[in-house]
Amino acid sequence: MVTVASLAALDGHIVFDDLQARRRYAPFRAYRQSKLADLILALELDRQARTHNWNLHSIAAHPGWAMTDISTSRLSSKQGLQERLTRLGAVWAFKLMGQSAAHGALPIEFAAMAPEARDGGYYGPDGRGERRGHVGEAFIPLPRATWGGAAAVAGGRASDRHVAIVVSR
């Protein structure tokens, strides 16, 4: 199973007592949280598969800064001038420092098909900031110190083997 994460996970924070963002919603904040949650799910699924000897392979990947519709789809004449200029600046940054959608797909393809992709691995571009480049191992933005508090909120304990949450029932 390949989970598609994002560099947005680097700035993601999971608000456990407001997972649906009912109190305070911001689109990109919700996106960052969802991509961090995707990565956590992939790592925990790998841990569970190993623990229970399931014939399941869980690997995660991200495309770096790939020029896809997600980077341009929010341009709208209904937006204010400042918001449109900010969005246009982001589009140019993606063009200058990112890569094509086809190159962004390579880490995901690697995770799905390469025999050397390891279970529990996380892959992305190997260039500066993981924005572009050849396929390589990606940085996992899950500081171990976070998990004690996160596990306590979830009613469980932090796993020593992986940086994932183990919830006790």
Ranges and model annotations:
Residues 1-78, 158-169:
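Rossmann-fold NAD(P)H-dependent dehydrogenase/reductase core
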Residues 18, 145-146:
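Short, solvent-exposed helix-helix connector turns and helix-capping sites enriched
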Residues 22-29, 65, 71-103, 128, ...:
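Alpha-helical membrane-targeting segments
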Residues 34, 87-139, 147-154, 158:
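C-terminal helical subdomain
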Residues 58, 66, 123-124, 140:
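Compositionally biased, intrinsically disordered low-complexity regions enriched in proline and serine
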